[in-house]
Amino acid sequence: MLDRTPPDAYDNGDRVPVIVLPGIWEPWRFMLPLAKVLHAEGHPIYPVPGLRLNGAPLDASAEKVAEALSEHDAPRVVLVAHSKGGLVGKQLMLHPKVGHRVAGLVALCSPFGGSTLSLPVLARTPLGLFSPANSALTALAAEQAVNAKIVSIGSSYDEMVPNGTHLEGAHNITLEMAGHFRPLVSPSAQQLVLQEVRRFDTSPDPGH
């Protein structure tokens, strides 16, 4: 059966809100295994249904997230992203109107330097974004002011991003597991994401 979890199912909590950003061709519910772990620890979860399957160009995707963020009154949020979602998240951090509201980005398996699997024949498709020579990707890479607020978590081997997920100036972590999708459902990777989200969380401890 198709998952029909409504977007507001996990929007309550007393910790810093988390906006979840899936990868390309992934619906927001693809992030549910990780979102549920974060919500159980008090983080409201804000998905962005307007991204649909996240196949739009980078700037258009970031604008959709900016619109969604504008609908929430939380002064600060943390972004938790998978794959292309990490690129969208960094683009959002550079947004002139809402970028300042992003406390940090925790990205899983995000190809900040593109993927060596990208082929020239894909250049005019949504997958063309992942070419290391793509103009939108290289422009994003040149913007390094926000990198210190990014945690890039990569697998020991990623079949979709074999060249790795290292981002200059970011906090880079390599998991002791392989796979592009496995970290989303791995308890140890989920706990690591939670730990890194907490580094950006300035909310007072509940009950204090």
Predicted regions: what they are:
Residues 5, 10-11, 97, 122, ...:
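Generic hydrophobic alpha-helical membrane-segment signal
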Residues 1-16, 40, 208:
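Alpha/beta-hydrolase fold catalytic core
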Residues 2-6, 69, 73, 141-144, ...:
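Generic secondary-structure transition motif, activating predominantly at the C-termini of alpha-helices
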Residues 14, 102, 169-170:
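A broad structural signal for short, well-ordered beta-strand segments within beta-sheet-rich domains
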Residues 18-29, 33, 37-148, 160:
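Serine-dependent carboxylesterase/thioesterase catalytic core
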Residues 9-10, 69, 141-144, 163-165, ...:
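Short secondary-structure boundary/capping segments
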Residues 146-208:
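C-terminal catalytic-base region of ester-bond hydrolases, centering on the histidine
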